[in-house]
Amino acid sequence: MSQQGGSFSAQTKEELLHTVPAHDGCIRAEMAAVIQACGSLVLTQRGLHLELISDHPALVRRMFGYCKKMTGQSAQLLVRQNKRLNRRNSYILRLIGRETVLGLLSQLGIWEDGMVQGTPRGLERTCCRRSYIRGLFLCCGSVTNPEKAYHLEWTLKEESLCQDLLALLEKEEISAHAVEFLEGVKEKMLMWPISKKAMAWRRCWR
């Protein structure tokens, strides 16, 4: 599960958030991953809009910049205060407008036949594939300090997304496996622990 604060996971994510995508294809791949992992389509009286929710403000700001670049429109940025003890605030990016939202999803290669698809098109390039893996990690990944105990994982809600990630990691020659578990009473989630040679994970997002 993702950790923030001063943890090694948090430090790793801060480092990754300063990664400059090689080209627009890498931007599309990273953004597609973020939308699939922590985004949702919401239908209201105002129409269709896209919401991204994260407890990492820098990630939301990064996606705000990507949205502006790809759609020419500014998304809304909101903060939701969590009143539970020791819970971080949630940061929300909201892109409004059916035409804008579906146009963006189409550009990202994850909208087809009226629904959000799995792995986006265009991940044949190594840099784009690694950008997609990086986006998933920024949303729902965690890693321990390899100098202490090596462990890297992604916590994902969709089995299809998990299978896609396994296939992408295999292309990176990183061995992984799936572990299914229950969180609370209702929510069923999936987790991918990885044990490999120390620092091998760095190939995933460079």
Predicted feature locations:
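Sequence-level preference for short, compositionally simple segments enriched
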Residues: 1-51, 55-59, 77-89, 98, ...
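DNA-contacting interfaces and partner/effector-binding or oligomerization modules
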Residues: 54, 60-61, 65-206
